[in-house]
Regions:
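Positively charged n-region of N-terminal signal peptides that target proteins for export
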Residues: 1-4
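Bacterial N-terminal signal peptides
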Residues: 7-17
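Bacterial Sec-dependent signal peptides at the C-terminal "C-region" and cleavage site
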Residues: 15-25
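N-terminal mature ectodomain segment of secretory-pathway/periplasmic proteins
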Residues: 23, 28-105, 139-140
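Flexible, processing/modification-adjacent segments and terminal tails
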Residues: 23-36, 43, 96-162, 183-190, ...
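Short amphipathic beta-strand/extended segments with alternating polar/hydrophobic composition
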Residues: 65-68, 89-94, 108-115, 168, ...
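Structural motif
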Residues: 83, 146-147, 202
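Gly/Pro-enriched, hydrophobic low-complexity segments
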Residues: 150-241
Length: 243
């Protein structure tokens, strides 16, 4: 279960930052508009790293844990959380995804699909400025009405073929909902819906601070960012797999 929680946390961080709606405007016009809506090019590029503290709740299991997440641009990440008295640590150094076994104290490399998900969750914030550079393509699929309001529907496709459906508020250009697929703790592919809200400025950069995910129609996970501290001068060794 813990790896599933880690993957969910990585996913909502990526999608909760910036997404791109398309319409009759040109791509360049859309990129310029969305970039400005999220603080502008300078604000995005000014974020060198982040330290995020918050909580994760899994209502169906009556589980609530605190976490600390470190993100260094362009592609490094480390997540620490305490579950049932044990500290779980997972990281990505730009090349290798790994996790620390709390019982042995040794780090092991994470293989397969989980490693791909972790790498994707460590994507640079600046991908918005040049999606193609990061292997991302976007297709506008029209509009869809949700609770009486129309949202722009965007299909986001990564270079490995993985897809997500994004629902964009046409008034704010912020992500309202994400529909995606992932493997659950039983390694069964499931569809999840994540609602993002409580957007706040972090040194001029706009990102969601509250994410609620639903699995099979029921609330599965609630992630709250309590504090986001940018530009803390994180060192690379923090993200390396311990030998």
């Amino acid at each position: 279960m813990k790896r599933f929680i880690f993957i969910c946390l990585l996913g909502v961080f990526l999608f909760g930052s910036i997404q791109i709606p398309l319409n009759s405007q040109t791509m360049d016009e859309i990129l310029k508009e969305i970039t400005q809506a999220h603080g502008g090019k300078a604000a995005i590029e000014n974020i060198k790293d982040m330290k995020i503290t918050g909580t994760i709740e899994v209502p169906q299991q009556e589980l609530k844990v605190s976490f600390t997440q470190y993100k260094k641009e362009p592609d490094k990440r480390r997540i620490e959380m305490k579950v049932m008295g044990m500290v779980q640590i997972q990281g990505f150094d730009g090349k290798t995804a790994w996790e620390l076994n709390p019982q042995t104290g040794k780090a092991i490399e994470i293989p397969g699909e989980d490693a791909i998900d972790i790498k994707r969750g460590s994507l640079a914030l600046a991908w918005i400025l040049d999606p193609k550079k990061y292997g991302i393509s976007l297709v506008y699929k029209g509009r869809e009405k949700i609770d009486g309001k129309y949202y722009l529907v965007l299909e986001q496709v990564y270079s490995d073929g993985d897809k997500s459906i994004l629902y964009i508020d046409p008034e704010t250009y912020l992500t309202f909902k994400i529909k995606s697929k992932m493997l659950d703790e039983m390694m069964v592919e499931v569809e999840t819906e994540t609602y993002l809200s409580d957007y706040k400025s972090v040194k001029g950069y706009i990102m969601a601070h509250k994410m609620i995910s639903y699995l099979r129609g029921k609330e599965y996970m609630r992630i709250i960012y309590k504090k986001v501290k940018p530009n803390t001068r994180l060192r690379d060794h923090l993200f390396l797999m311990q030998k």
